[in-house]
Amino acid sequence: MSFVCGGSWKFQSGCLEELTEFAKHQFALNRQHPDGSTERDHLESVERQTGRRPSALDGPPLPYDIAHVWLWFNDLSAARGNNGWGPNALNYQDMAAWMMLTGTIVRPQEISAILMLDRLWMSEQAKATAAARKAKG
């Protein structure tokens, strides 16, 4: 898949790849441990205690040209439903309602990017759930 980068609506794969790498790093930092804390919490605690910033806190930068897609994804994700077994994936109906309520105009390529981010997020949630089950025995 490709995405816009560099202020042009010509699609370039590098920009979406940068967003993907940024998102993977953020999702990994936000992964919850069985005690309810996140990986980010643990690393920031190390930083506070030692005065040294763990390199794992510093990941790829958010690509400026498509930062809005990341913000939109987070906005949609914060309102996602739950089916009793875990979080629901975002869907077109969720996005259509969000666009209508916020007045946001989203291009088809941006919708694809949001759905790609959601697949990554759901995958990270599945890993966290599996780790929690394994920790419980």
Question: What are the functions of these language-model segments?
Answer:
Residues M1-G137:
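An amphipathic, hydrophobic-aromatic interaction surface with interspersed Lys/Arg
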